[in-house]
Amino acid sequence: MPSKLAAEPQLVWKTLLPSGGLGGIAANDKFVILGHRDFSDFQDVFHCLDATTGKSLWQIEYLAVDNLDYGQSPRTTPSIVGDQVVLLGAMGDLHCVELATGKILWHHNLKTKFAVTGDLPWGYCGSPLIVDEKVIVEAGGAEASLVAFDLKSGKIVWQTPGKAPSYGSLNIGQLGGRTQIVGHDATTLGGWDVDTGKRLWTLTPPIEGDFNVPTPLILDGKLLVATENNGTRLYQFQTDGTIDPTPVMENNRLTPDMSTPVVVGNRLFCVNRFLYCLDLNRGLKELSRKRDKVLGDYAAMIADDAHLLVFGDGEILLVDATQDDCPIVARQKFSDTKVDVFSHPALVGDKLFLRSGEIVYCWSLASTDNAKANQ
Protein backbone atom coordinates (compact mmCIF):
# COMPACT_ATOMS: atom_id res chain seq x y z
CA MET A 1 0.00 0.00 0.00
CA PRO A 2 1.34 3.45 -0.82
CA SER A 3 1.66 6.08 1.89
CA LYS A 4 1.26 8.82 -0.73
CA LEU A 5 0.10 9.16 -4.32
CA ALA A 6 1.94 10.75 -7.21
CA ALA A 7 0.36 13.91 -8.60
CA GLU A 8 -0.37 12.13 -11.87
CA PRO A 9 -1.16 8.43 -12.36
CA GLN A 10 1.65 6.34 -13.82
CA LEU A 11 0.23 4.13 -16.55
CA VAL A 12 2.01 0.81 -17.09
CA TRP A 13 -0.42 -0.56 -19.68
CA LYS A 14 -4.06 -0.61 -20.69
CA THR A 15 -6.11 -3.18 -22.60
CA LEU A 16 -9.44 -2.70 -24.36
CA LEU A 17 -12.07 -5.43 -23.87
CA PRO A 18 -15.26 -6.08 -25.87
CA SER A 19 -17.40 -5.01 -22.91
CA GLY A 20 -17.33 -3.68 -19.39
CA GLY A 21 -18.02 -5.86 -16.41
CA LEU A 22 -19.13 -6.00 -12.79
CA GLY A 23 -16.96 -8.84 -11.46
CA GLY A 24 -13.77 -8.21 -9.55
CA ILE A 25 -10.20 -8.68 -10.80
CA ALA A 26 -7.92 -11.43 -9.47
CA ALA A 27 -4.18 -11.04 -9.95
CA ASN A 28 -0.73 -12.13 -8.89
CA ASP A 29 2.68 -11.04 -10.16
CA LYS A 30 2.23 -13.00 -13.42
CA PHE A 31 -1.45 -13.17 -14.29
CA VAL A 32 -4.54 -10.95 -14.28
CA ILE A 33 -7.92 -12.74 -14.48
CA LEU A 34 -11.32 -11.15 -15.09
CA GLY A 35 -14.66 -11.86 -16.72
CA HIS A 36 -16.63 -9.98 -19.37
CA ARG A 37 -18.94 -10.64 -22.36
CA ASP A 38 -18.22 -11.11 -26.06
CA PHE A 39 -19.28 -8.57 -28.71
CA SER A 40 -22.56 -10.41 -29.36
CA ASP A 41 -23.43 -10.50 -25.63
CA PHE A 42 -24.27 -14.20 -26.03
CA GLN A 43 -21.17 -15.58 -24.31
CA ASP A 44 -19.30 -15.23 -21.05
CA VAL A 45 -15.58 -14.67 -21.50
CA PHE A 46 -12.97 -15.17 -18.80
CA HIS A 47 -9.70 -13.57 -19.80
CA CYS A 48 -6.12 -13.98 -18.58
CA LEU A 49 -3.75 -11.09 -19.21
CA ASP A 50 0.00 -10.88 -18.70
CA ALA A 51 0.48 -8.83 -15.53
CA THR A 52 3.61 -7.16 -16.92
CA THR A 53 2.43 -6.23 -20.42
CA GLY A 54 -1.37 -6.56 -20.46
CA LYS A 55 -1.21 -8.90 -23.44
CA SER A 56 -3.81 -11.65 -23.72
CA LEU A 57 -2.51 -15.07 -22.64
CA TRP A 58 -5.70 -17.13 -22.87
CA GLN A 59 -9.44 -16.93 -22.62
CA ILE A 60 -12.35 -19.31 -22.24
CA GLU A 61 -15.80 -18.53 -23.58
CA TYR A 62 -19.11 -20.33 -23.49
CA LEU A 63 -22.75 -19.68 -24.33
CA ALA A 64 -24.58 -17.95 -21.45
CA VAL A 65 -27.87 -16.28 -22.35
CA ASP A 66 -30.30 -14.68 -19.91
CA ASN A 67 -32.06 -11.38 -19.27
CA LEU A 68 -30.55 -10.26 -15.98
CA ASP A 69 -30.81 -6.83 -14.44
CA TYR A 70 -27.62 -4.75 -14.87
CA GLY A 71 -26.34 -6.76 -17.83
CA GLN A 72 -25.18 -10.34 -18.29
CA SER A 73 -21.48 -10.19 -17.37
CA PRO A 74 -19.99 -12.27 -14.52
CA ARG A 75 -20.41 -10.66 -11.10
CA THR A 76 -17.94 -12.70 -9.08
CA THR A 77 -14.20 -12.35 -8.50
CA PRO A 78 -12.11 -15.30 -9.78
CA SER A 79 -10.40 -17.33 -7.05
CA ILE A 80 -6.72 -18.07 -7.69
CA VAL A 81 -5.42 -21.03 -5.69
CA GLY A 82 -1.99 -22.46 -6.50
CA ASP A 83 -1.79 -23.28 -10.21
CA GLN A 84 -5.56 -23.19 -10.69
CA VAL A 85 -8.26 -20.54 -10.89
CA VAL A 86 -11.97 -21.01 -10.18
CA LEU A 87 -14.45 -19.00 -12.26
CA LEU A 88 -18.19 -18.47 -11.75
CA GLY A 89 -20.46 -16.75 -14.27
CA ALA A 90 -23.74 -14.98 -13.59
CA MET A 91 -25.79 -17.83 -15.10
CA GLY A 92 -24.17 -20.43 -12.84
CA ASP A 93 -21.32 -21.81 -14.95
CA LEU A 94 -18.58 -22.92 -12.55
CA HIS A 95 -15.18 -23.73 -14.08
CA CYS A 96 -11.84 -24.77 -12.65
CA VAL A 97 -9.01 -24.13 -15.09
CA GLU A 98 -5.22 -24.23 -15.20
CA LEU A 99 -3.95 -20.78 -14.35
CA ALA A 100 -1.07 -20.77 -16.83
CA THR A 101 -2.91 -22.20 -19.85
CA GLY A 102 -6.67 -21.84 -19.38
CA LYS A 103 -7.16 -25.58 -19.84
CA ILE A 104 -10.56 -26.51 -18.40
CA LEU A 105 -10.16 -29.11 -15.64
CA TRP A 106 -13.85 -29.40 -14.73
CA HIS A 107 -17.15 -27.59 -15.17
CA HIS A 108 -20.67 -27.59 -13.70
CA ASN A 109 -23.70 -25.44 -14.36
CA LEU A 110 -25.21 -24.88 -10.92
CA LYS A 111 -28.72 -24.09 -12.13
CA THR A 112 -29.14 -27.25 -14.18
CA LYS A 113 -27.15 -29.61 -11.96
CA PHE A 114 -29.12 -28.73 -8.83
CA ALA A 115 -32.51 -27.95 -10.40
CA VAL A 116 -32.49 -24.34 -9.23
CA THR A 117 -35.95 -22.88 -9.80
CA GLY A 118 -35.78 -19.70 -7.71
CA ASP A 119 -35.75 -16.31 -9.38
CA LEU A 120 -32.22 -14.84 -9.61
CA PRO A 121 -32.74 -11.44 -11.28
CA TRP A 122 -29.11 -10.43 -10.69
CA GLY A 123 -27.65 -13.89 -11.33
CA TYR A 124 -24.96 -15.58 -9.26
CA CYS A 125 -22.97 -12.89 -7.45
CA GLY A 126 -21.11 -14.63 -4.60
CA SER A 127 -17.47 -15.42 -5.32
CA PRO A 128 -16.32 -19.04 -4.81
CA LEU A 129 -14.84 -19.73 -1.37
CA ILE A 130 -11.79 -22.04 -1.38
CA VAL A 131 -11.21 -23.96 1.87
CA ASP A 132 -9.07 -27.08 2.41
CA GLU A 133 -9.12 -28.16 -1.26
CA LYS A 134 -12.88 -27.52 -1.44
CA VAL A 135 -14.69 -25.04 -3.68
CA ILE A 136 -17.76 -23.81 -1.79
CA VAL A 137 -20.55 -21.97 -3.59
CA GLU A 138 -24.16 -20.95 -3.01
CA ALA A 139 -25.89 -23.04 -5.67
CA GLY A 140 -29.38 -22.12 -4.51
CA GLY A 141 -31.13 -25.46 -4.99
CA ALA A 142 -33.76 -26.68 -2.53
CA GLU A 143 -31.56 -29.69 -1.75
CA ALA A 144 -28.31 -27.91 -2.56
CA SER A 145 -28.36 -24.41 -1.13
CA LEU A 146 -24.62 -24.64 -0.42
CA VAL A 147 -22.37 -27.10 -2.24
CA ALA A 148 -18.73 -28.05 -1.75
CA PHE A 149 -16.79 -29.47 -4.71
CA ASP A 150 -13.39 -31.12 -4.61
CA LEU A 151 -10.93 -28.62 -6.08
CA LYS A 152 -8.97 -31.21 -8.06
CA SER A 153 -11.74 -33.42 -9.42
CA GLY A 154 -14.88 -31.29 -9.30
CA LYS A 155 -16.76 -34.07 -7.48
CA ILE A 156 -19.35 -33.12 -4.87
CA VAL A 157 -17.98 -33.35 -1.32
CA TRP A 158 -21.22 -32.27 0.37
CA GLN A 159 -24.41 -30.37 -0.29
CA THR A 160 -26.93 -28.99 2.14
CA PRO A 161 -30.60 -28.03 1.69
CA GLY A 162 -31.83 -24.48 2.05
CA LYS A 163 -32.88 -21.36 0.19
CA ALA A 164 -31.87 -19.37 -2.87
CA PRO A 165 -28.55 -17.51 -2.67
CA SER A 166 -27.97 -13.95 -1.59
CA TYR A 167 -26.00 -11.49 -3.70
CA GLY A 168 -22.96 -11.40 -1.43
CA SER A 169 -20.05 -13.73 -0.78
CA LEU A 170 -19.43 -16.25 1.98
CA ASN A 171 -16.74 -15.94 4.64
CA ILE A 172 -15.06 -18.42 6.99
CA GLY A 173 -13.51 -18.24 10.44
CA GLN A 174 -13.58 -19.23 14.10
CA LEU A 175 -16.83 -18.33 15.82
CA GLY A 176 -17.91 -19.81 19.14
CA GLY A 177 -14.97 -22.21 19.07
CA ARG A 178 -15.94 -23.67 15.67
CA THR A 179 -14.58 -23.12 12.21
CA GLN A 180 -17.66 -22.25 10.20
CA ILE A 181 -18.80 -20.75 6.95
CA VAL A 182 -20.94 -17.65 7.42
CA GLY A 183 -23.05 -15.63 5.03
CA HIS A 184 -26.53 -14.89 3.80
CA ASP A 185 -29.04 -16.82 1.79
CA ALA A 186 -31.89 -14.89 0.16
CA THR A 187 -33.54 -13.90 3.45
CA THR A 188 -31.45 -15.03 6.45
CA LEU A 189 -27.98 -14.97 7.96
CA GLY A 190 -26.45 -18.35 8.75
CA GLY A 191 -23.50 -20.51 9.69
CA TRP A 192 -22.52 -23.88 8.21
CA ASP A 193 -20.09 -26.59 9.27
CA VAL A 194 -17.13 -26.49 6.90
CA ASP A 195 -16.62 -30.28 6.88
CA THR A 196 -20.22 -31.45 6.41
CA GLY A 197 -22.22 -28.44 5.23
CA LYS A 198 -24.68 -28.85 8.11
CA ARG A 199 -26.42 -25.60 8.98
CA LEU A 200 -25.48 -24.61 12.52
CA TRP A 201 -27.74 -21.60 13.10
CA THR A 202 -30.12 -19.19 11.39
CA LEU A 203 -30.83 -15.53 12.12
CA THR A 204 -33.72 -13.69 10.49
CA PRO A 205 -33.27 -9.90 10.62
CA PRO A 206 -36.08 -7.82 12.15
CA ILE A 207 -36.69 -5.84 8.94
CA GLU A 208 -37.36 -7.76 5.73
CA GLY A 209 -36.10 -6.93 2.26
CA ASP A 210 -32.30 -6.78 2.51
CA PHE A 211 -30.56 -7.71 -0.75
CA ASN A 212 -27.65 -9.01 1.37
CA VAL A 213 -24.84 -7.80 -0.89
CA PRO A 214 -22.09 -6.79 1.61
CA THR A 215 -19.98 -9.70 2.87
CA PRO A 216 -20.05 -10.33 6.67
CA LEU A 217 -16.73 -9.77 8.45
CA ILE A 218 -15.25 -11.94 11.20
CA LEU A 219 -13.59 -9.78 13.87
CA ASP A 220 -11.93 -11.40 16.90
CA GLY A 221 -14.54 -14.12 17.25
CA LYS A 222 -17.48 -11.81 16.48
CA LEU A 223 -19.48 -11.27 13.29
CA LEU A 224 -19.97 -7.85 11.71
CA VAL A 225 -22.96 -7.53 9.36
CA ALA A 226 -24.02 -4.44 7.39
CA THR A 227 -27.13 -4.23 5.19
CA GLU A 228 -29.39 -1.55 3.75
CA ASN A 229 -32.48 -2.10 5.92
CA ASN A 230 -31.07 -3.40 9.21
CA GLY A 231 -27.96 -1.26 9.54
CA THR A 232 -24.59 -2.33 10.92
CA ARG A 233 -24.47 -4.88 13.75
CA LEU A 234 -21.85 -6.85 15.66
CA TYR A 235 -22.81 -10.27 17.06
CA GLN A 236 -21.10 -12.53 19.56
CA PHE A 237 -21.38 -16.33 19.74
CA GLN A 238 -22.26 -19.03 22.25
CA THR A 239 -19.71 -21.70 23.16
CA ASP A 240 -21.52 -24.23 20.94
CA GLY A 241 -20.91 -22.09 17.85
CA THR A 242 -24.40 -20.61 17.57
CA ILE A 243 -25.02 -16.90 17.26
CA ASP A 244 -26.39 -14.73 20.07
CA PRO A 245 -29.30 -13.05 18.26
CA THR A 246 -28.98 -9.79 20.21
CA PRO A 247 -26.23 -7.56 18.75
CA VAL A 248 -23.56 -6.33 21.15
CA MET A 249 -23.13 -3.20 19.01
CA GLU A 250 -25.34 -1.41 16.47
CA ASN A 251 -25.21 1.59 14.18
CA ASN A 252 -28.43 2.34 12.31
CA ARG A 253 -27.04 5.17 10.20
CA LEU A 254 -24.57 3.08 8.18
CA THR A 255 -26.87 1.12 5.83
CA PRO A 256 -24.87 0.11 2.75
CA ASP A 257 -26.60 -1.28 -0.32
CA MET A 258 -23.46 -2.84 -1.80
CA SER A 259 -20.21 -1.81 -0.10
CA THR A 260 -18.50 -4.28 2.22
CA PRO A 261 -16.89 -2.57 5.24
CA VAL A 262 -13.13 -2.61 5.81
CA VAL A 263 -11.52 -2.61 9.26
CA VAL A 264 -8.23 -0.92 10.17
CA GLY A 265 -7.32 -1.30 13.84
CA ASN A 266 -10.38 -0.25 15.84
CA ARG A 267 -11.90 1.72 12.94
CA LEU A 268 -14.51 0.45 10.52
CA PHE A 269 -14.81 2.14 7.12
CA CYS A 270 -17.59 1.88 4.57
CA VAL A 271 -18.96 3.92 1.66
CA ASN A 272 -22.65 4.62 1.21
CA ARG A 273 -22.84 8.07 -0.40
CA PHE A 274 -20.46 9.18 2.38
CA LEU A 275 -17.22 7.68 3.67
CA TYR A 276 -18.15 6.48 7.16
CA CYS A 277 -15.69 5.78 9.96
CA LEU A 278 -17.04 3.96 13.04
CA ASP A 279 -15.26 3.08 16.30
CA LEU A 280 -15.30 -0.63 17.17
CA ASN A 281 -14.07 0.15 20.68
CA ARG A 282 -17.01 2.45 21.43
CA GLY A 283 -20.12 0.65 20.28
CA LEU A 284 -19.77 1.52 16.57
CA LYS A 285 -19.89 5.22 17.39
CA GLU A 286 -19.57 7.41 14.31
CA LEU A 287 -16.16 9.10 14.27
CA SER A 288 -16.58 10.83 10.93
CA ARG A 289 -18.81 10.94 7.89
CA LYS A 290 -17.30 12.57 4.81
CA ARG A 291 -19.01 13.63 1.63
CA ASP A 292 -16.94 13.75 -1.55
CA LYS A 293 -17.83 14.36 -5.18
CA VAL A 294 -16.53 10.93 -6.24
CA LEU A 295 -18.48 8.89 -3.66
CA GLY A 296 -21.79 7.25 -4.52
CA ASP A 297 -23.72 4.18 -3.44
CA TYR A 298 -20.67 1.93 -3.76
CA ALA A 299 -16.90 2.10 -3.57
CA ALA A 300 -14.31 -0.64 -3.38
CA MET A 301 -11.64 -0.22 -0.72
CA ILE A 302 -8.19 -1.71 -0.06
CA ALA A 303 -6.39 -1.16 3.26
CA ASP A 304 -3.25 -1.87 5.22
CA ASP A 305 -2.66 -1.05 8.90
CA ALA A 306 -2.42 2.70 8.32
CA HIS A 307 -4.02 3.72 5.03
CA LEU A 308 -7.13 3.17 2.98
CA LEU A 309 -7.51 3.35 -0.80
CA VAL A 310 -11.04 4.25 -1.88
CA PHE A 311 -12.00 3.85 -5.54
CA GLY A 312 -14.62 6.43 -6.42
CA ASP A 313 -16.10 7.71 -9.67
CA GLY A 314 -12.99 8.34 -11.75
CA GLU A 315 -10.64 8.98 -8.82
CA ILE A 316 -8.64 7.17 -6.15
CA LEU A 317 -8.69 8.60 -2.63
CA LEU A 318 -5.93 7.89 -0.10
CA VAL A 319 -7.21 8.10 3.47
CA ASP A 320 -5.20 8.25 6.70
CA ALA A 321 -6.85 5.47 8.71
CA THR A 322 -4.98 6.22 11.94
CA GLN A 323 -6.84 9.43 12.83
CA ASP A 324 -10.39 9.80 14.09
CA ASP A 325 -11.29 12.39 11.46
CA CYS A 326 -9.95 10.02 8.75
CA PRO A 327 -8.57 12.76 6.48
CA ILE A 328 -8.23 12.33 2.72
CA VAL A 329 -4.49 12.97 2.32
CA ALA A 330 -4.19 12.52 -1.45
CA ARG A 331 -6.26 11.89 -4.53
CA GLN A 332 -5.47 10.76 -8.05
CA LYS A 333 -7.69 10.99 -11.12
CA PHE A 334 -7.64 7.92 -13.39
CA SER A 335 -10.42 9.01 -15.76
CA ASP A 336 -11.34 12.36 -17.31
CA THR A 337 -15.01 11.42 -17.09
CA LYS A 338 -17.00 10.36 -14.05
CA VAL A 339 -17.05 6.56 -14.27
CA ASP A 340 -18.73 4.25 -11.78
CA VAL A 341 -16.35 1.45 -10.76
CA PHE A 342 -18.30 -1.61 -9.64
CA SER A 343 -15.51 -4.10 -10.41
CA HIS A 344 -13.24 -4.56 -7.39
CA PRO A 345 -9.62 -3.79 -8.37
CA ALA A 346 -6.55 -5.84 -7.42
CA LEU A 347 -3.35 -4.51 -5.84
CA VAL A 348 -0.14 -6.55 -6.25
CA GLY A 349 2.89 -4.80 -4.77
CA ASP A 350 2.65 -1.26 -6.13
CA LYS A 351 0.75 -2.34 -9.27
CA LEU A 352 -2.96 -1.57 -9.33
CA PHE A 353 -5.17 -3.45 -11.80
CA LEU A 354 -8.42 -1.57 -12.31
CA ARG A 355 -11.32 -1.83 -14.75
CA SER A 356 -13.11 1.30 -15.95
CA GLY A 357 -15.78 0.60 -18.54
CA GLU A 358 -14.30 -1.54 -21.33
CA ILE A 359 -10.70 -0.73 -20.39
CA VAL A 360 -8.44 -2.59 -17.96
CA TYR A 361 -5.59 -0.48 -16.62
CA CYS A 362 -2.39 -1.29 -14.82
CA TRP A 363 -1.25 1.72 -12.81
CA SER A 364 1.94 2.02 -10.79
CA LEU A 365 1.24 3.47 -7.35
CA ALA A 366 4.94 3.80 -6.56
CA SER A 367 5.93 7.31 -5.56
CA THR A 368 7.71 9.29 -8.25
CA ASP A 369 10.88 9.23 -6.12
CA ASN A 370 10.81 5.43 -5.96
CA ALA A 371 9.99 5.15 -9.65
CA LYS A 372 13.01 7.32 -10.58
CA ALA A 373 15.28 5.36 -8.24
CA ASN A 374 14.30 2.10 -9.95
CA GLN A 375 14.92 3.39 -13.48
Predicted regions and their residues:
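Noncatalytic, solvent-exposed loop/strand surfaces
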Residues: M1-Q375
